[in-house]
């Protein structure tokens, strides 16, 4: 083993590490950045006086005065009456203030942004590959969900169907396949 070169890892470091002539310098690979936007960003206009209370209401953190006095802030919970599950596994409509998938009036766009700080070659054997972690679901994935405007007070609910269909249940008693009933019903 012939030492031909010394490498210092930190500029101010006095310790040096010896390096073999056949060795190569390996730099750390910068991970790919993947940002998936499901909802369009919403612009909220406010003045300087109300900015702090707006941020606290959006993040759910209490105001400084409430934290010092020990008073608990009342959480706003949406209560809906529980409806019984139907035997025929039909979709159930519920009243809601649910805005998760219905924000911005159903005007959804899915946008992927890719980027990396360094486009050098990578050693995929030593680093965990995140490519397979998020599967490409295709364009038709989100079209299977019912989208309504935010002015609507109804949200489509789906009942988990554990018996495929009532007709198939008699024929295949031992078959325990599961599926979702995703028939769209317009209740407006």
From Swiss-Prot:
Location in or out of the cell: Nucleus
Taxonomy, superkingdom: Eukaryota
Main location class: nucleus
Pfam families assigned: VQ
Entry keyword set: Nucleus
Stretches for region Disordered: 1-20, 58-92, 157-188
Compositionally biased intervals (Low complexity): 161-179
Annotated motif VQ, positions: 51-60
Gene Ontology terms: cellular component: nucleus
One GO term (biological process): seedling development
PANTHER family referenced in this protein's UniProt entry, alphabetically: F16F4.1 PROTEIN-RELATED (PTHR33143), VQ MOTIF-CONTAINING PROTEIN 18 (PTHR33143:SF74)
Note: Plants over-expressing VQ18 show stunted growth phenotype.
Role description: May function as positive regulator of plant growth.
Name listed for the protein in its UniProt record: VQ motif-containing protein 18
Taxonomic placement: Eukaryota, Viridiplantae, Streptophyta, Embryophyta, Tracheophyta
Gene that this polypeptide is encoded by: VQ18
